[in-house]
Amino acid sequence: MSLTNEQIIEAIGQKTVLEVVELIKAMEETFGVTAAVAAAGPAAAAAVVEEQTEFNVVLVEAGDKKVNVIKAVRELTGLGLKEAKEKVDGAPQVVAEGVSKEAAEDAKKKLEEAGAKVELK
């Protein structure tokens, strides 16, 4: 029994991005081809989306509770009082660089609870 194009598209649509990437690699190896576009222009930006694994925690603004934010920065970074205060006063500043998604979300939560505005990049 042969699958129709619609059945194939439906099956691919149910896969995660990671599974589709693995499928593409397997097809490239099996058929000896590449999925790269020959001369892609700016309009043909069909890049495979990969999930980001490393994040930077950026302190955007200290907010009203600056003392609490300084305490949170010290706790997260291990900086001294002076260095943590300089980081908070100089916002926007990177508080944590190249951390996992879970660690970045934890840091963001702690800083926001202290009253800061935070972004993950």
Swiss-Prot record:
UniProt keyword annotation of Ribosomal protein present: yes
Q: Name one Pfam family in it.
A: Ribosomal_L12
Q: Has the keyword Nucleotide-binding been applied to this entry? A: no
Q: Which GO terms describe its biological process?
A: translation
Q: Name one GO cellular component term.
A: cytosolic large ribosomal subunit
What SUPFAM superfamilies does the database record attribute to this sequence?
ClpS-like, Ribosomal protein L7/12, oligomerisation (N-terminal) domain
Q: Write the record's keywords in alphabetical order, separated by commas.
A: Ribonucleoprotein, Ribosomal protein
Example GO molecular function term? Answer: mRNA binding
Q: Which domain of life is it from?
A: Bacteria
Task: Give the family, as the similarity comment puts it.
Answer: Belongs to the bacterial ribosomal protein bL12 family.
Q: What does this protein do?
A: Forms part of the ribosomal stalk which helps the ribosome interact with GTP-bound translation factors. Is thus essential for accurate translation.
Fill in the subunit field for this protein: Homodimer. Part of the ribosomal stalk of the 50S ribosomal subunit. Forms a multimeric L10(L12)X complex, where L10 forms an elongated spine to which 2 to 4 L12 dimers bind in a sequential fashion. Binds GTP-bound translation factors.
Q: What is this protein called?
A: Large ribosomal subunit protein bL12
Give the organism the record lists: Pseudomonas putida (strain ATCC 47054 / DSM 6125 / CFBP 8728 / NCIMB 11950 / KT2440)
